[in-house]
Every structure is written in structure tokens, then in C-alpha cells.
Amino acid sequence: MRDPFDWLDPALDALHRAHWYRQPLLSGTPAAVVSVGEPPRPLINFCSNDYLGLANHPQVKAAAIAAIQQWGTGATGSRLLSGQRHLHAQLERAIAQWKGTEAALVFSSGTAANLGTIAALVDQRDLVLGDAYNHACLKKGARLSHATFYEYPHNNVAALAQLLETHRSQYRRCLILTDGVFSMDGDVAPLAKILALAEAYTAMVLVDDAHGTGVLGTNGAGTLAALGQSSPTIIQMGTLSKALGSLGGYIAGCQALITYLQHRASTWIYSTGLSPADAAAALAALEQLQTDPSLRQALGDRIQQLEKGLQALGCPVLPRPLPTPIFCLPAPDPATVLQWGQELQEAGCWVAAVRPPTVPFSRLRITLRADHTPGHIEQLLAALAALLKCC
């Protein structure tokens, strides 16, 4: 019999030739300095989404350990069967209060939250419009829903308005998808203008705020809070796995929406509930976030330091209406960005060399943490300065 997997080796060879293959290995605890590779070597970590350093916070870890001791390691079932725990309801109430919504629903991941919510809200009778730079799971969710799906150029509100004017009247429902903070560039969606269009054309808006959650707005409530925006059309999505240092994703919105998703979002219905440890860790992280402003202040200081340093080096920095912890430096091709990443590692800095198909063009993606020191940023800037001289 012919091997049905004989296509895999050529496919993997193609990944290597295109410089798309990746498999980094970390040792030890998450922190500003981590051990990378085999044999492990210490590098300043500019790849992490643990923006506030809460994944290694003593009180967050203690909460997770205590939850395991009290409730065990797993939820042991889907939440509509045997997997519902008091911790889940407690976490969802805390998220809703934090986000200023009537209710919230916790999923096993941010991707599951997006895929399940989009498929529950729209189908082949409906219209979905999304920013071209949206996270991959928003795009995948739109396609899996079988709705008619159009992308508009990045942050181009005029193009979005034209799509709504041309197509909206032909469909039952309309859902607009956008990141709050775009994950690869760190820029921010023009949410006020998008929400105005949504209200004018009777459209729902799902804002994926994975990278604004915990970082922007009062008490880290996110991009919408930072911009002072609210609307009955909004569906707020965020993660527990980035600034909150745990695992999972959530949807926050009106009570009717959340009740509907509990009975129609397949990625929630058919998944085991979030583990007690993850739920407890997220709750503890939320408490730290809202009671200890020093974490966000430290992150803001490092963002400001790096932004000024990059400008002094003449690096192209995107306009930043809000202080997000993501910076990108374009590269001409995958081979070059891999070389840059290797040279930065030799200088003691671990920076993500991001290539297609994750992004349309290669770039260095720099992310900051609250526990980075001024010296860490200075070392990165010195390494980038040396790199630019050689280019």
C-alpha cells in the first residue's frame, strides 16, 4: 500500500527552504531573562506576551496551587455537564465588572472564543467584514461560518463604509471583525469610526482585544476603555493568557449574547471547562492588575524608552495613538529577518523573527514586559544600532 503520508516530507522540506520552519525551546520560568535552546543560554526576552509578568507572580502562582489542592487539576467535563465550577462563575462575574458589561463567558482559549462566537452569530445568510491585518483566528472564523466574507484594507474606514453601503442590505445580519491592538504591528483600530458605521448600518462589532487586555485603559480594561468607547453593538473578546498570565479567552457583552453563546457556541459547549488552576490564576491576576498600578506604570516606562530609542536610531515606528507594548521593524525577506534574529541573539536579545505565512512580510517583532529594566532596553537598542550599521 502506498503511504498516505508520503507528502509530508516534501512539505516539510518546502518549509525549510522558505525559512518558515520554527521550533524554539525554553527552559525555566517565564521572566524578562529566559534560557533558550539546547544547550540553554540566557537571553533577554523580547518575544513574550506576558506583558505584566503575572505568569510568574507569587500571588498568581499561589492561587493556582491552592485551586489544585481544593478542586483538583481538571474541570473533568464540559460546563453544560459536569465541568461547571464556582470558580468559573466567579471569574466571569469579575471579567464583566472589569469590562463594564452585563456578563462574560470564559473559553478554553482566545482562538476558541473567536471561532465559536463567530460561527454562533452568522451563517451563509449573513455578511462578515474584517480588517486585512486581523488575527488569523478571526479570518478562519469568518470562513468557517460560511457567511459572505470581505476584507477591507488595514484600518481603512472609508473602504469599510463602501463595503457596508454596497452589501449590507443584501444580508440578514452583519458582523464587523477587528483587532483592538493589532498583534504584529502594535497599532490600534479606529474603533470610534467603526462603531459609528456599525450603528448606522445595524451591524455587530467583535473587537479582539487580546493585546490590549490588561495593558490599556483604566485598570487595564482594554482598548475600548482607553479610547472611551462604548456601544450596544460591541462584542468584547480578550485573553487570559497574555497580560493576565494564565490560560483561556473570554467574550464579554450583554446578558442575552452570553446566554445565547452558552447554547450555540460549539467551541464552548463541546470543550472541557477551564481548569481550576487556570481560572484561579486569572482571578488572582485580575486582582493584581486592579490593585497594583506599578505593573502597568513600569511597562509604560519601558514602552516610552524603547519608542524614543528607536526614533533616535532612525527606525520606522508606526504612529501609536496608545502606548502598546508591540513594535515591529520590517525586513526585506525571511532569510534576512532570520539572520537579524540570530545576530540579536548573539548580542543577548531574543527577538521574534516573524515570517510568512504568519504575516504578509517579514519583520522583527519586539514585545516588552513590565519586568524589563532600563538596562535591558539599552542593550536591545545597542544591538539594533550595530545591526543597522551592517545593513
Swiss-Prot record:
One of its GO terms (molecular function) is 8-amino-7-oxononanoate synthase activity. Pathway: Cofactor biosynthesis; biotin biosynthesis. Its EC number is 2.3.1.47. Keywords: Biotin biosynthesis, Pyridoxal phosphate, Transferase. Pyridoxal 5'-phosphate binds at S183, D208, D209, A210, H211, T239, L240, S241, K242. The keyword Transferase applies. Its cofactor is pyridoxal 5'-phosphate. Substrate binds at R22, H135, T358. Gene3D superfamilies: Aspartate Aminotransferase, domain 1, Type I PLP-dependent aspartate aminotransferase-like (Major domain). It comes from the Bacteria. GO terms for biological process: biotin biosynthetic process. The keyword Transferase applies. Homodimer. This is Putative 8-amino-7-oxononanoate synthase. It comes from Thermosynechococcus vestitus (strain NIES-2133 / IAM M-273 / BP-1). The lineage of its organism: Bacteria, Bacillati, Cyanobacteriota, Cyanophyceae, Acaryochloridales.
